[in-house]
Amino acid sequence: MPPINIEAARRIQERLARQVTYAPLPPVETVAGLDVAYSGSLAFGAAVVVKRTTLEVVETACSVSRIVVPYVPTFLAFRELTPMLRAYIKLKSKPDVILVDGHGVAHPRRFGIASHIGVVLKKPTIGVAKSRLYGEEVGDKLVDPATGEVLALIIKCGGKKYVSVGSYATLDEAAGLVAQLCKSGDVYPLRLAHELANKLKKAHLPDDKDRDSCP
């Protein structure tokens, strides 16, 4: 696996971060969760669309991709973008909002994986992370220590969830929507995507002909 070119990746993030858009969410009827699981040299992407009000599953899609980029902190998108997008583009029913297992603007360069996906797809995206990547916790907020800017809101859904804008959303609306989607101690669309990605990983065989089928 070739190493990532850190400086080139940093420049890409800094350039694309200027395209992050803060805007009110559209009317939200459906929400997708995106996640990735790993086994050996393969990445298993999952997308699960649910109805916002009932949490009923509308559609699922999966992908299997070869890992071509190692994990490097703050550059997660360069590893997970491909499996997530390959699953997402297979969805027939495109969701109103996308939740991503990772950060949005709560990132040193304001461009975590949720922002990357939002800019690429030009869709409302929200980052939901279980751990802090950048910033200082002040009450229920994650704040940039240099500027005082609020990067994320911290909600309790099981444990802490750090909710940040990916793109085409506002922070208050993003946190409010994620709180609505909390069920049984987790953000439900993301839990379903996590479970599906791991189920695909366990079911996958090296000689599978239909590699991308959800189990």
Swiss-Prot record:
Belongs to the endonuclease V family. InterPro entries: Endonuclease-V. Its EC number is 3.1.21.7. The keyword Transmembrane does not apply. The record marks Y71 as: Interaction with target DNA. Mg(2+) binds at D35, D101. This is Endonuclease V. One of its GO terms (cellular component) is cytoplasm. The gene is nfi. It comes from Pyrobaculum aerophilum (strain ATCC 51768 / DSM 7523 / JCM 9630 / CIP 104966 / NBRC 100827 / IM2).
